[in-house]
Amino acid sequence: MLTYILSTPRSGSTVLTALLEKKKGIICMPESSFPQILGSLDQKERSNERWLAALYIAGTFPPTPITLDEAEACMGGNDEEILFALGKALATKLSRPADEVTEVVWKTTRTIGMHKGLLATKGKFVIIHRNPLNVFESQFRVSFGKGNRNPLRFAVFNESYQNAFNRIPQDRKYELKYDDLPGALDGLLDFLGVEDYGEWPDGKGAMDLVAERCSWLNQITSEFENTDSLKRDRLDTKTVNQVNTAMAFARPLRPLLGPIRSYFDGRSVSSIRSRAKTLLA
């Protein structure tokens, strides 16, 4: 089976992934827009397995341990078969028995509004929410957060994500809060229909590799500790009021923000396609 984790950036999807991938039978892929892109391709592109492999490599944002040739070998079949095959290939690279993989988890914080291909599979969706004040505060601790340090821009950007989340059928999605981790895992596993067989006995998880390459994620593989309330307490009153006011202003705009979400999704896809072409040049 397949699971798709969606969230706004800096909302805890990587923490959730790190917790899930410890569970025996579950393989979590490094953050990738490949499932969304795969579901948007025409038949001509779908028939070019080398091109699909390049899109997978280019669309996976922490570098994937799967090589171009290994990815190409996974590109036969329908979307569901391809996405599951890539999970088994990753399990092999991580020294975990591929024949014991029962659930492959894909997550992204980018091409969030592109649901067509994902909905065509039998996969389920998991949406993780974090207190907006914590998400805003975190923009100042990562270089890629520079664009969202203005409260109003941040609020509109956030609501464009909520627009996308609302377009997923209710019976296909499970929503949880960052503050509910790790206790929410039991309910999540029940929703996914995944038996809890304990933890993998050996082998590294994908998030271990990600943490080695992304300095801002170096705490995800340690024991989970939620310090969000302390981080909120450090925000000055003026900032809190500005963010709350901006969020209140932007919330009624949510139903109208589909085009903004499509714009950002389109920019991500264009960048991925460009990188894929460079890989094959």
Enumerate the predicted regions with their spans.
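PAPS-dependent sulfotransferase catalytic domain
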Residues: 100-199
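The Walker A (P-loop) glycine that initiates the GxxxxGKT/S ATP-binding motif of P-loop NTPases
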Residues: 7
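Acidic-histidine catalytic/liganding microenvironments
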Residues: 23, 109, 250
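Short, charged, surface-exposed secondary-structure boundary motifs
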Residues: 37-40, 135-141, 205-211
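ATP-binding Walker
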Residues: 10-11
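PAPS-dependent sulfation machinery
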Residues: 29-106, 112
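A conserved segment at the C-terminal end of the G1
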Residues: 14-26
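PAPS-dependent sulfotransferases, especially Golgi type II membrane carbohydrate sulfotransferases
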Residues: 1-4, 194-281
